[in-house]
Amino acid sequence: MSNKLNKQISTEISECYLKEKPQQSFKKSNEIKMSNELINKISNEISNCYLKEKPQQAKKETKKKSIRSLPTDLPPLKSITPLKSWIFLQCRQMDANGNPLCCGVSGRYTQPGTQCILWQIDENDPSQLWQISKDGHLVSLLAGNYVMDYNNDGTNLAIANGWNNYTSQIWTYNSSTGQIENSNYPNTCLGIKGAFNEPITPTNGTELVIDQPIDNNNLCFQWDLVPSYPLNTILTSPPQAFPTFPGDQNTAFIEISQYLSNVDDIRSQYTNLSVSLPFFQSQMSAMSYPSYLSHEEFDFVRDQLSTEFNYAQEIINLIGNYESFHNELFADNSARLNQLATLCQLEIGSDINAMGSVIQVFSGMMYSILEALPGVGPILGNVLQTAVNIGVAASDGHSTIQPDPFQVALSNLWDTLSTNYEALLSNVSNMETMLLQDWGMMVTTHGLIETLSGPNSLAWQSSMTGDLISAAVPGYEISLLQILMPSKYQIYRYDLANNGNVGLPDDIPSSCLWTDPNDSNITYFIADNETTKVYPDDSLMSLIWGNGVSEQEFFLSANGWNFCMSLLNDNIGSGAPTISNNTSTALNFKIQFSPTQIYNYDVPTHSSNFTTEFDNTAIENSYYQITIYDNTNSWVASISVRVDIFVMRGADVSVLSSSCADGYYLGTPNCLQGSFAHSFTGSINIPIFEN
């Protein structure tokens, strides 16, 4: 509250107290309790003043108190394992105006060998978002299997390159020094070209190299991962008790506690959301000195508690801002999901299966926010991602977020999603409790709330919430559509040079059609799973394109899309498989139709690949084996597939068995029957996720 309001409230409290107890002085704690009538009166006056001064904040706090309470007696967190997430690589050396610059790919080109450069944090620039793979590759969001490397022509320029297993592409982030170290040359790290002797001031377009700086304190070779998720460290730090008060200070502490809330320990009220810490602050400011305590001792305790009240209220406001964001986005009782299902021509109450991943929903939403609001988006990420990390590891069912992919009927989809949304909010409340009950955590968090910018900032102002919601909605809607659309639609591939005399439908809407820019003979279109004559509405496709999805990632199932791919030709007896790699690790798969008919395909990071081959020996039913490997040729998964061929009907594809290595999740395969009447093959999509 403002100083003016504090003074006004203090005066009102003093006047009210004098009217009620004009002759009473502070002697013993049991003699200073105000009547319930007076407490209610003062509370009402404070509330009225508070509403006039901070109407939006007061409204938010009232809502908080009415819908939730904080848990207590939580066990300490020993560790938090961060999940894979998209981040900025932000150089600690600022430009001449004190603005941060991030590592990106020059021109946003996807050609191997493109220079990595520094550039101001830019909206909607996927080349500035990176993900660290399990083995240390720095994977770009710009394209699958597009990773950071360096040029071995003697220039040592940092480049974006195609994935390989050379150590030049393996990096380690040293959190102690802030250096991104290269595994190929010891003691070398990513930095600004020409700055190994001493720091220089970078500009947009400054080239990056790997080099060995003379001074490890050189900011040109130091980086922050943004968001940095500082709450992971704070919440796992050793417990630190609040300062103790000896002798008369403890007497003063009890005196104040009794006066404010009729308890012996006012700190027990920090997690009680039904009380107002600003009200306590103003009450405490108005207290007269007890006659039996020195002013110095009393002021010492009052000053310490005043600091604690301020720090605690900052944390409550931070979590309250997240809660407002969360409720606006997720607590709509399935309204947004129902609207999108209607756009997809799906009945949300039907028993049609939907498949997806809650982690993918959160991830898609988060990188949408980072792209749209690179300045303030990381503040939300610093809160949300830690809560997700805690939820995935939680053993308490109420707080557990489901990490593995799910398959549910559409009628149960909202229940599945909302259970995880509630678990996310529960973990945020748990975080709030832990921060409010530990002095060390409270002090550190206060410092980050006061830090207005930077990778560790938690300075979430209430005015930011609307922008964060607006930035989150596109990513959230796309994530929901990635779950819904494969239940109704698949991608069809038409090859003009190899079509078996089957023609391309002539009524495909332009919004549902895409020609491969690298091969004009290849056309992709989206249509109903059962017929090539039913297409998504233009309103649905406009929503997808309007939310920034590229045609290439949509029609080739990249960045969270997991469509089946059917081949449009007269070979209707085949069952075309698509492998969707939803991980930051490069994969490949082998498909074996027979001992002599074996094919191998790469599956880039966050991308899909498929085969146009089929069993050329099959007359009736056929079987094939799919084996998936990682980039080191280690086994990841195996799937046995059966293709049943029916006269005058399309091939029916099914999975006989499957298995998966530790560290990965195999999603439920989506199996679709082909069509004799419409001349398309059976199809299957097999999604794979990281554990």
Swiss-Prot record:
For this protein, the record's InterPro entries field holds:
Ca_Up-reg_Membrane_Reg, Ricin_B-like_lectins, Ricin_B_lectin
Recorded superkingdom: Eukaryota
Q: Which GO terms describe its cellular component?
A: cytoplasm; nucleus
Mind listing the GO biological process terms from this record?
A: response to cation stress
> What's in the keyword line of the UniProt record?
Lectin
Which GO terms fall under molecular function for this chain's record? carbohydrate binding
Q: Which residues form the Ricin B-type lectin domain?
A: 47-174
What protein family is recorded? Belongs to the cup family.
Q: What is this protein called?
A: Putative calcium up-regulated protein I
UniProt organism field: Dictyostelium discoideum
Starting at the broadest rank, the lineage of the source organism is: Eukaryota, Amoebozoa, Evosea, Eumycetozoa, Dictyostelia
